[in-house]
Amino acid sequence: MNACLRLGTARFFCRLGRSLASFLLAAAVIWVGAAPAHADMEKIRQSGSLKVALYKGLPPFSDNVGGQFTGIDVALADALSKQMGLSAALLPFDADDDGMSGDLRNMVWKGHYLGYGPADVMLHVPVDPAFIRQNHQVLIFAPYHREGFVLAYDHDRIHQVSRFEDLAGQPTGAEKGSAGANALLSGAQGALRDKVKIYAEADAALLALFSGEIAAVMVTRSQYESALKTQGKSAARFPVTELESPVLPPRGWAIGMAVKEDQRALAQALESALQALRESGELQRIFARYGVSIVAP
């Protein structure tokens, strides 16, 4: 399944343009003057569980492996719930064809027309000012990681890459529908297009790199680092570099959470739980478990 097509986090940023960097320095939601929905928060506590919406097919954050849902966001959902004295009730879902605003509608503030959802909170939501303004029905807050695209390449075949032109004549790859694919296809004024191979999944593109089928691949840093761990490959043999492209956000993008707009007490509780995980080192350990270096948002 195509995570970037279905999730659209990376694809969303193809259309986004340059985000406001200053906003992300203060991305946490400010609650001054708000009237928390204590009654709804009490219902959650009485139920004993926190319903958490997670994307399907988004390794290393959330994916079904051997019939078990696993990944960074899965572990984070469990840790947040435990910190709040609750158990996690996972609601995995496929992304809506209408994009991430449709995902927020289905999984946070309204529910799917087939009766699935809404959850109490959704993870892996881009914390971006323009996106927040477009989705007033939800609170988007608590960034916990910064993601971005990198170019991983085979050092035995390419000595150094500092610009797209350095890939001339080399077979490259990326995931279908991703911003990384668009960057390669448009890089060097389109001169690389004939050598770009498109794969159904980022993992497949990375395996093609490791096997020698291609010489370089454009994926997210988390996908790259996780693949190094699971495939037992060396970063010295397969290093990464960051290339500038009009279709890639220059500083990557922050990912956080979303709750329904009137659930401010819940958002406060989640913010506090996340901070506790950060201070104890548990958040970093969760990422490290999957081979991913957490990047401050």
Predicted regions located by residue number:
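N-terminal secretory signal peptides that target proteins for export/translocation
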Residues: 1-16
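Bacterial N-terminal signal peptides
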Residues: 17-32
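Extracytoplasmic small-molecule ligand-binding "clamshell" domains
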Residues: 42-119
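Periplasmic-binding protein-like
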Residues: 56, 145-150, 232-271, 291-297
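Bilobed "Venus flytrap"/periplasmic-binding protein-like clamshell domains
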Residues: 69-83, 150-200, 222
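Extended ligand-binding regions for polar small-molecule ligands
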Residues: 74-83, 155-158, 165, 170-171, ...
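Acidic, polar ligand-binding/catalytic clefts
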Residues: 90-165
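A ligand-binding cleft/hinge motif common to bilobed small-molecule-binding domains
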Residues: 123-134, 183-187, 210-211, 215-249
